[in-house]
């Protein structure tokens, strides 16, 4: 059968599917199932080739990157290269067949993975499997190619995955038997000295437009050369316009002073489920704009670029305090944490942000550091004296600490612009977050209560806990920025981020997730039990109450918008808006297994009749 006949056959099959979906079971609508490779209605090689031509040859058939280290595909040179590159976060961001760590590359069992972390030398290994790595990737380079990819996925009922840099800690950047749109090559960057939206004369000030694939570190460097600071995260290989800017956009450096990323986004360009390319801002498609400002990435469409405010670069002094104690001395460690959290509380009142980082070392010593960001300051001597006065009680409880301050002519030089190099450890990570209210943090006993909980939190070597400073403009922006974030963000002061190390086995992942959900998260939520708020971008992958802790009262409206813009659920995002209607991998609507079987049978029958 030639390509044209194949395409005509596919359209006939679609018509049959529409007919049966409408009349087979009238009480359950819409009927939506996704096609799997073993089914006759999976796109044929001719259809994949035709689609590849439509996107200028940008389609890749994916295998796990480590397959070159396994039989029967063993290639020593390629395997050597892989082992050399595998710890480079920049390489991982650009490669559609890997994620930032192995945790969500693997399936549910040992025969659903192709690990590279356990390989130390390029010797032929056995048992490489696809796992959760998508089967195909459209490595798009234009919005028009994104449109073609979305239409292809919709036409053929494919499980669609949107991937930028592969940083998602809940597995949203991969899925078994899926078709990936890889947005990392959308690399436009354009600065505007005085932005005005199309159709408006109102000045919005300096801004930058970035393609979906632009990473934080690259944007930081470009902005610094232009004399600007950008509100972004700590990791330089996170994509700016993807999950970061659609899921909230917490900045460890600037949120206290400038708010959240969603507060400062001015416009999105997006390909919706029907394959249309739209602009969403305060003047057009306002409902969609509201949903994209906090509703989560990969949910309402494929964002191809975004425009956000930038801020004049300023001088700054950064003060860092380091302290360490054995885990066996919990009382002094609790007091030490309380002292530095009291210092953070005091400095927050003067709009000085800070970030606490707690790590457990292999020798089971616990170490903490806290950085304070004094913007528009240059006098290190004065700041050191103030810091010493805030830390006096550390001497009383006999905790040794070091204090160092440095003045920067431009605060942007503090931003990390060099891609991460993964550690030599073979573990991956999962993450979770809990917000602390301003009411608790600013109370007289708040820092002590938080310190006690953090000191008692069971942590293992490789685990990390750090805070992100909210409050300030995060709270006041609630009066002027209409976003879909949980309303409680406008009453939050700190975000506790817990990163849990996962050993290199499926069993380790299962145990780590169970411990995170059932032990550590309840302990963190108990700090401020009436303020149950979490950050979806770094949320517990097993969060059962995700609608409430991520969006609260905004979830109902978000769900309605999802139904209007993507009624068939083409864009599935784990623990995302509308995901409760689907199974855990987004392959089939819940409670429709019988319908799925019937439609699959009819589709297979129709395919065999047309192609037979």
Swiss-Prot record:
Enzyme Commission (EC) number: 1.-.-.-
EC category name: oxidoreductase
Domain of life of the organism encoding this protein: Eukaryota
GO molecular function per UniProt: FAD binding; oxidoreductase activity
Listed GO biological process terms: indole alkaloid biosynthetic process
InterPro entries: BBE, FAD-bd_PCMH, FAD-bd_PCMH-like_sf, FAD-bd_PCMH_sub2, FAD-linked_Oxidoreductase, Oxid_FAD_bind_N
Keyword ATP-binding: no
Keywords: Alkaloid metabolism, FAD, Flavoprotein, Oxidoreductase
Pathway: Alkaloid biosynthesis; ergot alkaloid biosynthesis
Transmembrane segments: none
Pfam families attached to this UniProt entry: BBE, FAD_binding_4
Requisite cofactors: FAD
PROSITE patterns associated with the record: FAD_PCMH (PS51387)
Residue ranges of every copy of the FAD-binding PCMH-type domain listed in the record: 129-313
Family: Belongs to the oxygen-dependent FAD-linked oxidoreductase family.
Stated role: FAD-linked oxidoreductase; part of the gene cluster that mediates the biosynthesis of fungal ergot alkaloid. DmaW catalyzes the first step of ergot alkaloid biosynthesis by condensing dimethylallyl diphosphate (DMAP) and tryptophan to form 4-dimethylallyl-L-tryptophan. The second step is catalyzed by the methyltransferase easF that methylates 4-dimethylallyl-L-tryptophan in the presence of S-adenosyl-L-methionine, resulting in the formation of 4-dimethylallyl-L-abrine.
Protein name per Swiss-Prot or TrEMBL: FAD-linked oxidoreductase easE
Organism (species): Arthroderma otae (strain ATCC MYA-4605 / CBS 113480)
Gene name of the encoded protein: easE
């Amino acid at each position: 059968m030639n390509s044209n006949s194949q395409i005509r056959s596919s359209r006939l099959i679609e018509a049959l599917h529409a007919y049966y979906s409408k009349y087979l079971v009238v009480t359950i609508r819409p009927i939506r199932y996704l096609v799997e490779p073993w089914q006759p209605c999976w796109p044929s090689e001719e259809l994949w080739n035709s689609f590849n031509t439509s996107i200028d040859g940008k389609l890749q058939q994916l295998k796990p990157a480590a397959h070159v280290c396994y039989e029967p595909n063993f290639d020593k040179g390629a395997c050597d290269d892989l082992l050399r590159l595998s710890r480079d976060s920049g390489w991982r961001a650009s490669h559609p067949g890997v994620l930032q760590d192995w945790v969500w590359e693997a399936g549910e069992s040992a025969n659903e993975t192709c690990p590279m972390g356990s390989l130390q030398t390029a010797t032929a290994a056995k048992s490489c499997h696809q796992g959760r790595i998508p089967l195909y990737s459209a490595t798009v380079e234009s919005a028009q190619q994104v449109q073609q990819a979305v239409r292809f996925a919709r036409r053929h009922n494919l499980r669609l995955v949107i991937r930028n840099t592969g940083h998602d800690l809940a597995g949203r950047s991969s899925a078994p038997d899926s078709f990936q749109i890889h947005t990392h090559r959308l690399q436009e960057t354009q600065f505007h000295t005085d932005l005005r939206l199309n159709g408006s004369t109102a000045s919005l000030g300096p801004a930058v437009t970035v393609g979906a694939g632009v990473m934080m570190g690259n944007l930081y460097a470009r902005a610094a050369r232009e004399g600007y600071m950008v509100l972004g995260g700590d990791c330089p290989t996170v994509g700016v316009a993807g999950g970061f800017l659609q899921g909230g956009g917490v900045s460890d450096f600037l949120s206290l002073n400038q708010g959240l990323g969603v507060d400062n986004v001015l416009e999105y360009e997006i390909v919706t489920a029907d394959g249309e390319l739209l602009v969403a801002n305060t003047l057009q498609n306002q409902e969609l704009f509201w949903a994209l400002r906090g509703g989560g990435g990969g949910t309402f469409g494929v964002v191809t670029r975004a425009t956000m405010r930038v801020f004049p670069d300023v001088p700054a002094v950064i003060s860092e305090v380091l302290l360490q104690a054995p885990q066996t001395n919990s009382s002094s460690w609790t007091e030490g944490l309380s002292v530095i959290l009291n210092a953070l509380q005091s400095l927050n009142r003067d709009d000085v942000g800070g970030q606490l980082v707690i790590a457990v070392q292999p020798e089971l010593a616990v170490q903490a550091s806290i950085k304070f960001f004094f913007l528009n300051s240059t006098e290190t001597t004065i700041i050191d004296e103030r810091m010493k006065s805030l830390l006096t009680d550390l001497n009383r409880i006999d905790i040794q600490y070091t204090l160092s301050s440095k003045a920067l002519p431009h605060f942007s030089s503090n931003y990390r612009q060099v891609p991460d190099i993964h550690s030599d450890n073979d573990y991956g990570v999962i993450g979770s977050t809990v917000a602390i209210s301003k009411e608790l943090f600013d109370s007289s006993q708040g820092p002590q209560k938080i310190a006690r909980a953090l000191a008692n939190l069971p942590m293992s070597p490789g685990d990390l806990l750090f805070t992100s400073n909210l409050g300030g403009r995060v709270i006041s922006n609630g009066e002027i920025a209409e976003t879909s974030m949980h309303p409680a963000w406008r009453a939050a002061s700190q975000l506790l981020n817990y990163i849990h190390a996962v050993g290199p086995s499926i069993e380790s992942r299962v145990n780590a997730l169970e411990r995170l959900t059932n032990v550590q998260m309840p302990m963190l939520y108990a700090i401020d039990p009436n303020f149950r708020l979490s950050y979806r971008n770094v949320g517990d992958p097993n969060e059962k109450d995700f609608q409430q802790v991520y969006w609260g009262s905004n979830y109902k409206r978000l769900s309605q918008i999802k139904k209007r813009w993507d009624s068939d659920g083409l864009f599935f995002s784990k623990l995302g808006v509308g995901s409760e209607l689907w199974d855990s991998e987004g392959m089939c609507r819940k409670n429709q297994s019988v319908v799925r079987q019937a439609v699959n049978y009819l589709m297979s029958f129709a395919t065999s009749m047309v192609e037979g």
